UniProtKB/Swiss-Prot annotation:
Organism from which the protein derives: Yersinia pestis (strain Pestoides F)
Subunit (UniProt): Interacts with EnvZ.
Membrane topology, Cytoplasmic segments: 1-14
UniProt protein name: Modulator protein MzrA
Keyword Membrane attached: yes
Gene: mzrA
Length: 129
């Protein structure tokens, strides 16, 4: 019979339990940080002749009512407003409906966004050479 004993006379699996438990604990604790839901509002004109609203104008009104904004980005004939807190999405829609004139569609969406813990290791062509 083969005796698999470690250096101090304990079975080898005793030495593997602590690293495995620590690894599982790290995965459980870091998963919410890596995958977060991001709440966005997409604003686009419904009628011909309407242009996109000014992002700074929207920012002033949303910020004035206590809604925290991550970013406001133009994208494919629409304006995408990323909110800091998903809980404020309905309140932001109400503010935008009050501020914007008729003819704009406001579509809410939530997406899971992956954050990189170590952005240094991203494959970036500019860093090569």
């Amino acid at each position: 019979m083969i005796n698999f004993r470690g250096r101090f006379g304990r079975p080898l699996w005793h030495y593997l339990v602590l690293p495995v438990v620590l690894l599982l604990l790290a995965v459980i604790l870091l998963t919410p940080m890596i995958v977060q839901t991001e709440s966005t509002l997409k604003i686009r004109p419904n009628q011909q002749g309407l242009s996109l609203p000014d992002g700074f104008y929207l920012y002033q009104h949303l910020n004035g009512r206590g809604i925290h904004i991550k970013s406001i980005i133009p994208e494919n004939d629409s304006l995408v407003v990323s909110l800091e807190f998903p809980e404020q999405q309905m309140q932001a829609i109400e503010v935008l409906q009050d501020v914007l004139p008729a003819g704009y569609a406001i579509v809410a969406s939530e997406s899971k966004k992956r954050h990189r813990l170590l952005p240094v290791f991203r494959s970036n062509q500019q860093n090569l050479g």
